[in-house]
């Protein structure tokens, strides 16, 4: 990916994983050393428009997972991330918002993001995302607090 980003003929736009966990979860299975932040940094350096994906990291940054782990174990990293994200849920509660809304506000607040691609399953989730878009952006300090949780 970095080769394409740094090539003389660059992509018109890039989808980048943007979440406080800095995790691709189960979709990062092909490369254990995958680091979403390094991809995003290269995209920003090259001034490539960025579409944020995985804001709630397959449910890991929500109040509860909406499914059970698949028997094959292919999505285990998403469930591992859910457990890891407990401090994030604590901060969301302290700040008076749902974890999903806070995760979307985070993605919308990161400098260099052109748009956030949503993965919603119902109208309630969609409404929460629309509300997050209407809220003030997180401050740099709030962003750092969330990033430093992990």
Regions found by a protein language model. Give the residues of each.
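Beta/alpha (TIM)-barrel catalytic core signal, keyed to glycine-rich beta->alpha loops juxtaposed to Asp/Glu
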Residues: 1-150
């Amino acid at each position: 990916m970095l080769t394409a980003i740094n090539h003389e003929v660059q992509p018109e736009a890039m989808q980048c994983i943007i979440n406080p966990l800095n995790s691709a979860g189960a979709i990062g299975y092909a490369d254990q050393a995958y680091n979403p932040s390094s991809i995003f940094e290269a995209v920003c350096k090259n001034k490539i428009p960025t579409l944020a994906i995985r804001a709630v990291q397959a449910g890991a940054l929500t109040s509860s997972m909406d499914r059970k782990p698949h028997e094959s174990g292919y999505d285990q990293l998403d469930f591992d991330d859910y457990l890891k994200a407990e401090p994030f849920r604590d901060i969301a509660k302290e700040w008076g918002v749902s974890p999903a809304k806070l995760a979307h506000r985070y993605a919308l607040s990161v400098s260099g993001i052109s748009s956030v691609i949503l993965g919603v399953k119902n109208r309630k989730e969609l409404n929460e995302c629309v509300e997050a878009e209407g809220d003030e952006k997180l401050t740099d300090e709030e962003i750092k607090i969330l990033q430093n949780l992990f």
